[in-house]
Amino acid sequence: MVDLRQNFGISFRELELAVFQKMQEMFVTVMQDVLKELDAAVFRLRKKSRYQVKEVRSGCVATLMGDVEYKRRYYLDKETGEYVFLLDKALDVEAGRVSPGLAIAAAMQAVLGPSYRAARESLKRLYGYQVVSHETIRQLILRLGELIEKEEEKKREEAAGTRKVPVLFVEVDGYWLSMQKGKKRRQEMRMMVAHEGWEARTPSSKEYELVHKTHYLDLDSKDFWEKASRHLYSRYDIDENTMVVINGDRASWIRKGVEYFPNAIYQVDRFHIKRDLRRLLLGTRELKVCLEAADRSDLKTLTSSLAQARDRAKTRIDDLSQFAQIDELLKSIRQMPEAYIDYRVRLAGKGYDVSKMRGMGAAESNVDRFSNRLKKRGQSWSVQGLKAMVQSLVKYFEGKLEHYSKHTSRIHDLLDGAEITKKAVGVARQITSEITGVKQTNVPIMHAGTTRSGGLSRLFHTLSRDRLLTT
């Protein structure tokens, strides 16, 4: 058997790489021919009275299978006086940039990985060569963030949501990030996670997930609630019949959220209450009593036990700091006692059915998801870079990143004839079929899963569905 392998003179890995390289060469050739035919189609179907050909220019686009150099016509737009590549516009790609397919893969790797360099190396390991530079990936995320922010800002300005829900859950938290420049070397990222409740992951599952979850994150501390509330108003029809439950720690800026909705209540997050009790009462006999009282929303027992612990700490010089902190917590409970009562108890008293409602606290886990990419790996950020990454992460966690990564323009404003899309796809199919001669194709990465494949599995499924690949 060893002799047989030696006679081949090649290992499976070497064979795999050799075949893959040939596929890359074939892909580039096919793409060049397809682009040539599509440019000819654009030339035939353009608005001839508007677009005049001036010359033919070369371009290059980075794709999943390598750089594709191609030539296309350069037009004068007689209406605007500007020059334009109609093919690039029609395909929503610019020479010198990355293809939509590579954009999806790069964006996925950028938000999942620890850094842009790690994203570059991940793609390099997958394809066997450097597909794209880390700076190109960074620029991609910046453009992606700008695109998302413009769309979200437009929605906030309109603020005409139509979805109606009886109860809207709003969970808020903040965390600090390291910045690269400016007077503030650390800035607080404020985050809102809103949802409509909980549902089991599967019919028999004991694990739950949030229903219609949406995020809003901002570095602008002054206008946080103004923008965050409009984010919700752009999605929901919120009126006096909509109960908005705001959950968060004892920070004063979180409590202000109730002022932005007609009917809202604020609850101090149960996790934060218990964390403070454990920290302040560690080693005291009041700890267990206070924890149990907090679970029952028994404020009378909670405050009396806290008072006992505070008074005892006051008598010891080494516990004066503890005394002050317990006293501050006690004053907070007495000033806004309703905020320390479980929201379900309060809603039940108002006639709401709370049987399917669960304890709140999603903001804490979502902070971990975001901070894992933004702060736990030692990064420091520019304001622009941070905002772009945050927008990309939001869309990733909401399952919408791929949509924005492959964002396409409308070509009907540029070309005559609604049949252009159908004809373009037909040309692509015909050329691909003629050059490759492939009748049956099975691409393993189609079955690798979206996260594992960096979004490529969904891309290949789309190609298969459109019959660009026959499986």
Identify what each model region corresponds to.
Residues 1-32, 74-471:
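Catalytic center-proximal scaffold of phosphoryl-transfer enzymes
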Residues 26-44:
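N-terminal "assembly arms/tails" that initiate or stabilize quaternary assembly
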Residues 42-73:
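N-terminal juxtadomain amphipathic helix
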